[in-house]
Amino acid sequence: MKAKTLEEAYELNQARNSRVMGGMMWMRLGNARVKTVIDLSELGLDQIEETDHVFKIGAMCTLRQLELHQGLREMYGNGIAECVRHIVGVQFRNQATVGGSIYGRFGFSDVLTALLALDTFVELYNGGIIRLSEFVNRKKDKDLLLSIIIRKSKRSFRYDSVRQTKTDFPVIACSVVTGMVNGVESWYFSVGARPMKAALLEKQWEIPADISEEEIREYAKIVASEFEYGTNMRGSAKYRQHLAEVLIFREMRSIITEGRAWK
């Protein structure tokens, strides 16, 4: 059913057997009985709005829009594009939505892992605007996700992942962001596909530009050890922790050697 207003969409979604339709890339693989499918395509949620202070990404924006947006690239380099580049193919990314990727809170989500490390909020119809880090751990309900909001700030951002094949789900995914927060150098680490959903860790570290690689490795080891990992068909918990340590080291080294955004 094509909703005419957000209020109508929210009311329809309260029914037990109703589902909000995103890109249908994940929903179509399920076997749940769905009585009402709610289409949000006429509610203006398919644009990325940029202001002086934020990027506001509509829930119905596609991953391809996220990948190609020039403003996001100028602010965060290639990090945003990198987090979606390996997701199946261009045709898939032209249909899969950002809202579906975030609302699902999937363990394998590259998009969730990347955005969690940034200064990101979600806008809910009933729940208002809350931090993405809070939303990730919130119990799933029947609220509507309207947009994802990224606050602009001078931050350095890196994203990387390990996959068994190019377009497969990640074995591990890591995002590293650093910037000045209240005058203190802060580092944010997000690790996803553990295989649990992404989790966030914050450290207030003032790291000198002339730090040695061995010292960076020690920082990366500390960070990787503070996340919980699990075992599945793609890898063991120990293997994932090792990969996370390697990726975090590479991302931290890249940020430090190439210069931090605010310096």
Residue ranges of predicted features:
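C-terminal structural segment of proteins
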Residues: 1-263
